[in-house]
């Protein structure tokens, strides 16, 4: 009898451990999906709709910018969006894919500043804290007229 009780306790502990691990994974996935949705909304409002104030609703109490052509903070973001609105009012960025790793969201983007042009391939990396964007990095690569291969950049 003692052996049966001990075996049942081991099975119960194993099931509880697996349940807790599964719940933690689902919670992480839910938070990661929330982070993805935050960044996608931020990107759409800012880069496509060119509405800096609407985009800044998704930004935390700081915004650290690693792009050397844009300043830190909400004012730097407003200036960048103002530049896009003034110089490239018809620009559009199409997010080809997104990846999430905890508090980091990575976007692979086809950005076209002038309709009809080839545009740029961009990888944007955003860091979130408490569900808000607080940091941004990007790398930009012009799409060549004549590529060395038949693969696309997307």
Task: Write out the residue ranges for each language-model feature.
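Bacterial N-terminal signal peptides that target proteins for export
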Residues: 1-12
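C-terminal and inter-domain tail/linker signature
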Residues: 18, 22-154
């Amino acid at each position: 009898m003692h052996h049966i009780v001990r075996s049942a306790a081991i099975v119960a502990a194993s099931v509880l451990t697996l349940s807790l691990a599964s719940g933690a994974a689902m919670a992480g996935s839910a938070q990661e999906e929330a982070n993805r949705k935050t960044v996608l909304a931020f990107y759409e409002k800012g880069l496509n709709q060119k509405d800096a104030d609407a985009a800044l609703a998704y930004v935390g109490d700081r915004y650290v910018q690693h792009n050397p052509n844009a300043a830190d903070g909400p004012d730097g973001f407003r200036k960048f969006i103002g530049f896009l609105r003034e110089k490239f009012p018809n620009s559009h960025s199409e997010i080809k894919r997104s990846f999430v790793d905890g508090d980091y969201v990575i976007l692979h983007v086809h950005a076209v500043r002038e309709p009809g042009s080839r545009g740029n391939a961009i990888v944007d990396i955003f860091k979130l804290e408490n569900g808000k964007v607080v940091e941004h990095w990007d790398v930009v690569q012009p799409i060549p007229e004549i590529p060395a291969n038949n693969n696309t950049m997307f």
